[in-house]
A protein has these predicted regions:
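Membrane-proximal cytosolic interface modules of multi-pass membrane proteins
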Residues: 1-2
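Acidic donor-binding segment of Leloir-type glycosyltransferases
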Residues: 5-47, 52
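Short glycine-/polar-rich loops that comprise or flank the Walker A/P-loop
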Residues: 12-14, 98, 180
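Cell-envelope/extracellular polymer assembly enzymes that use nucleotide-activated donors
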Residues: 15-17, 156, 171
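Short acidic donor-binding/metal-coordinating loop in glycosyltransferase active sites
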Residues: 21, 69, 77-79, 168
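Long helical/loop segments within the catalytic core of UDP-sugar-dependent glycosyltransferases
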Residues: 32-71, 83-166, 177
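Acidic donor-binding loop at a coil-to-helix junction in glycosyltransferase catalytic cores
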Residues: 166-172
Length: 180
């Protein structure tokens, strides 16, 4: 939440929605942060559903009813976007046929263990080889579940977030690709 509010982007152009399906004490921490940032003039809301139905896709589907933005940036709770993120990514949407901008990410804990090193290597391969090849070939790039920005119209035209899947990112990506 702090990282999103620290983005180098005009505050009046952002509508920040914290989708919180947690069932532990983090809810109070989120509520306090949201209250603090509202006091600083941020358009920020803490959205809790009465159910966890559909998990992440369910939360995203629910939130789409309340967004007033043309673009929807999605960050998982463990993602820390760099301050320049929106300033570098949003200009790609100047082309009206762009529905998704998927950004690469780094690793804060890459050297923590052999497992995190292997995960970092795998993700680096995905970004540096697979997605680079797709981009250079002008092929559609899939949404990786976080660190991506969607044109809201693209989500809507593709049928929105479906909750009967555990891979909501790929599901929406493929439906958007089939729609053109």
């Amino acid at each position: 939440i702090n990282s999103v509010c620290d983005l180098d982007y005009p505050k009046q152009k952002m509508h920040i929605m914290i989708l919180d399906d947690s069932d532990d004490n983090t809810t109070e921490q989120v509520a306090e942060l949201v209250k603090n940032y509202k006091g600083k003039g941020f358009d920020i809301s803490h959205i809790r559903r009465g159910t966890r139905q559909g998990y992440k896709a369910g939360a995203l589907k629910y939130a789409m009813k309340y967004t007033k933005s043309e673009f929807v940036a999605i960050f998982d709770a463990d993602f820390i976007p760099p301050t320049w993120y929106l300033k570098r990514a949003i200009p790609y949407f100047a082309k009206p046929n762009i529905g998704l901008v998927q950004c690469r990410w780094g690793h804060v804990n890459e050297n923590y263990s052999a497992l995190t090193q292997a995960q970092a290597l795998s993700l680096d391969f995905h970004f540096l080889v697979e997605q680079k090849a797709k981009s250079n070939s002008r092929m559609f790039m899939n949404f990786n579940g976080t660190a991506g920005i969607w044109r809201k119209e693209c989500i809507d035209d593709s049928g929105g977030w479906h909750t009967a899947t555990l891979v909501e990112d790929l599901d929406l990506s493929y439906r958007a690709q089939m729609k053109g």
